[in-house]
A protein has these predicted regions:
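C-terminal and inter-domain tail/linker signature
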Residues: 1-121
């Protein structure tokens, strides 16, 4: 798999609740992340993702576009937590030895009355 394929596979699997197996296969043991809601270590984000999967068991994820440049991959995706909760999410992955070693993310909830006719997607 390319790094881009790994990033998308990881996002799809954790979104459907397959968190630990996705981590075991794709995440480097020395992984760090920049999600401000959790400690920056591997286990803290893993547990947070498991809790999110339990809270939103019907969550869906769609990768809309992805870019790969050397050891970096960026994925723009659409997450639907519930019928009235749709989010645009951008993940930036850094890879080392074929594994995800670092992760950044930014998200924005879709609003219905946006003045921008182009929207988030």
């Amino acid at each position: 798999m390319t790094n881009k394929e790994i990033a998308i596979d990881f996002l799809k699997r954790v979104s459907r609740g397959d968190v630990r197996p996705a981590y075991e296969e794709h995440v480097h043991p020395e992984f760090i992340h920049h999600n401000v809601y959790f400690k920056g270590d591997r286990e803290s984000l893993l547990v947070g993702m498991e809790e999110n999967a339990e809270e939103f068991p019907d969550k869906s994820y769609e990768a809309l576009r992805a870019l790969e440049d050397k050891d970096l991959v960026t994925v723009h995706g659409k997450v639907q937590l519930a019928a009235d909760s749709i989010w645009a999410v951008i993940h930036i992955f850094r890879f080392e030895d074929g594994k995800i070693i670092e992760l950044w993310e930014a998200s924005q909830e879709k609003i219905e009355d946006s003045p921008n006719e182009h929207g988030l997607f």
